[in-house]
Amino acid sequence: RHTRYQSLSRGLGDVYKRQIYMCSDPGQDKIRKAIEENKLDAVVNCNCSPSLHENTFRGVAAAEGINPYHCEIANIREWCSWPHANSPEEATQKALLIIRTTIERLRRNEALTPMVVPLTKKVAVIGGGIAGMQAALDIAQSGYQVYLVEKEPSLGGHAVQLSGMVLTLDSASCSISPMIHEVINHPLIEVYNYSEVEEVEGYVGSFTVKLRRKATSVNSKLCDSCGLCEKKCPQTVPSEFNCHLNSRKAVYRSYPDAVPNQFVIDRNTCLNFNGEECQVCKEVCPHGAIDYTQEDVLEEVKVGALVVATGYTLYPKEEIEEYENDADVLDGLQFERLLSSGGPTGGLIRRPSDRKVPKEVVFVQCVGSRDPENHKPYCSRVCCMYTAKQAILYKRAVPEGQAYIFYIDIRATGKGCEEFVQEGVEEEGLLYLRGRVSRIFRDGEKLAVWGVDTLSNKQIEINSDMVVLSMAV
């Protein structure tokens, strides 16, 4: 069929050359000779994906004096020969069309020259979780100034909420603590905690980032984190850090080992800022650190690049109508807080409804994930491994308990992950059931879980004490 390609190229007035592996050294030499002998000013390579060898062919063209953007690839492999391998005639017609359109596009291409613009050698990293902190450290260790912006009073993101690490089961907070302190103490990293990005202006290489430092109403220079204000504060609200499993005060710090170890007053819930006469925290503070007159501060920083590392949120479990919105139906992050020694129960596994030890716990994976018709179409990737970790930690905390795990597929990605899951089955007695859960509802003191085991083709009903949902990320 290559004669038809020759006919096409001759009809368009272009030079035609054929080589079985054009990306090879002989193929590249053939391109060089064709350019030199025929005084070409543009090249179309009819072969594979641009992601593989576009730079290769453009480099050859540039070396022969052709503008790199006058070199195009007509992808007749992935777009044509592979998907239509069983229809050679139709594939040939499609290949001819792809080549024709690529040639016509190339005739209209303009010669481009990459621009070099001055770069402000500073970077703003938005998000103080583990990804944002790692990015900040990598950039700072390369010698550049970094502004790390975190909306919460302390650094760490979701990582400091976790109980343990997958595979090692080491304490998550202890594992991440050295990184947090390295960020805080790095001379090239300036941390804007309890701050938010208001606006970004500018262009590539030069951005102006407007930041809002929210008023903490606590003078950090005077406060020694004694915690007396928090202890005496009369206003309690659900704790965001503990996923609403317990309460915090209107004046609070995220968690006892928070870095920065800074107290803030939540003006949305503080009685004093909502029309009531209350100054208890100010009255009991021995250092006079409470300052109700503080205002938000707007600042601008000039940077050449931004890194957005704003983390994730879990798909709300309330969106799953088939699963009852019950106190003992938790999402994965809530269960992490129950497992954590710094959590609302001090690491003791207790049902939120009555504080009893759950003897049967059902873990449901892919809740809201891999469901394109109703929820999210994608796999959240991390759920299989953190569910295995949670189930193992549950069994070690409650040896007489039983953990059931409903799954679709076990995607144990990463070195040692498959063995970790197998260890849970063999050593801790985790029971994996392949199938979806159709309904969860309260049945007296128990939670009825209706599902199916597709391997045995049987309907399953489990009366559990607690259900943990691996929600889509």
Segment roles from a protein language model:
Residues 419-473:
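C-terminal catalytic lobe of FAD-dependent flavoproteins
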Residues 24-26, 35-38, 81-86, 91-156, ...:
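Rossmann-like dinucleotide/flavin-binding elements
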Residues 14-37, 54, 63, 76:
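Metallocofactor- and cofactor-centric catalytic cores in central/energy metabolism, strongly enriched
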Residues 219, 298-305, 457-466:
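Core beta-strand elements of the Rossmann-like FAD/NAD(P) dinucleotide-binding domain
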Residues 1-16:
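Single conserved hydrophobic/aromatic residue that forms the stacking wall/gate
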Residues 14, 33, 59-75, 89-97, ...:
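N-terminal glycine-rich dinucleotide-binding loop that anchors FAD/FMN and/or NAD(P) in oxidoreductases
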Residues 46-47, 309-310, 364, 464, ...:
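Short, well-ordered coil/turn residues at beta-beta hairpins
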